[in-house]
UniProtKB/Swiss-Prot annotation:
Function, in words: The RecF protein is involved in DNA metabolism; it is required for DNA replication and normal SOS inducibility. RecF binds preferentially to single-stranded, linear DNA. It also seems to bind ATP.
Family: Belongs to the RecF family.
Residues that hold ATP according to the record: G30, K31, N32, G33, S34, G35, K36, T37
A GO CC term attached to the entry: cytoplasm
InterPro entries: DNA-binding_RecF, DNA-binding_RecF_CS, P-loop_NTPase, RecF/RecN/SMC_N, RecF_2
Location within or outside the cell: Cytoplasm
Gene3D superfamilies xref list: P-loop containing nucleotide triphosphate hydrolases, RecF/RecN/SMC, N-terminal domain
Stored NCBIfam families: recf (TIGR00611)
Matching Pfam families: SMC_N
Recorded GO MF terms: ATP binding; single-stranded DNA binding
Protein name: DNA replication and repair protein RecF
PANTHER family: DNA REPLICATION AND REPAIR PROTEIN RECF
Amino acid sequence: MYISNLRLQNFRNIPAKSFDFKNSINFIVGKNGSGKTSILESIYFLSHSRSFRSSQLNRIINHNADEFIIYTKAYNPDEITISLSRKKNSNNISKLNLEIQKNHTEITRNLPIQLINPESFNIINSGAQQRCKVLDWGAFYLDKTFLKIWQQTKFLVKQRNSALKQNYPYSYILSIDKKLCEFAEILDYKRQAYFTKLKPKIYEILSHFNPNLQLDIDYFRGWNLHKSLAQVLEESFNYDNKYKVTNHGPHKADIVLSVSHKPIQDIFSRGQQKLLICALKLAQGEIHNSENDNKCIYLIDDITSELDSIHTLTLFNYLKQLKSQVFITTTEKNKINEFIDTNSYILEI
């Protein structure tokens, strides 16, 4: 997959603009506030039907307009068109090859995106939910049955929490538990299958960036490894009932990152953390590319942030050999001069 043309209308501070890109590394250069991150955001929005910058989508519409439109022409390898529009206080309207989509799933499958930006540090510094999203992104593309299992599991956890809050009888909770355990086991199996591929690939890429970095990467399924979920839910019912929330289950799954049993945020510097994030994201993209025909697109906001020149160059050279489409933003062209070659494309805004 690669994007050949992107058109934006009333998206953020871009009233109307068309951009052409190469199926290689595309540098977007501009001052702060020039709109370079908005270009990355629009591509991400096309894939995910949401922003990585704001949950208040009305704010994304240019203040002089009532609607934004994103349109792209891409190749996968055949030409496809994807568009997304949104009016104020309305829902997104997504189209794939001019056909309105009932949901965004097919577009997401057609447009796999990996984003590396300042908020990516949340994978390390925030709770398990952020790391669990890493597993779910990969499993979604690896296994077409994953989404329905994930949706059903999420629904059952929500239903159980609601029943706890409303003090439903224990017999009713048990009926939910029976279904939840069934779907949770399948979900765990699919996540583990993806993690088995992801872990060695992270180590491989990280050693390329910095062979001296040592860490442990483990998968936690969300409940005791030596007990069934049914047993854990039964044993923890009084605690769950007291706090009116389900404390064990697949919604608590995590990728545990540590050094000698200590959290890596207590050990790694910011630069080392960014190298790990890059290794993780690149690993996800490489696994995707090996399992699917359409290649992952990488969005990197401010590539030089937190990295010295040596590690920035190492990262860039790694990106170049992937032969995937990459979008990189920077505020200063002189910081990327040594990375530019005949295959690169530079957009100055």
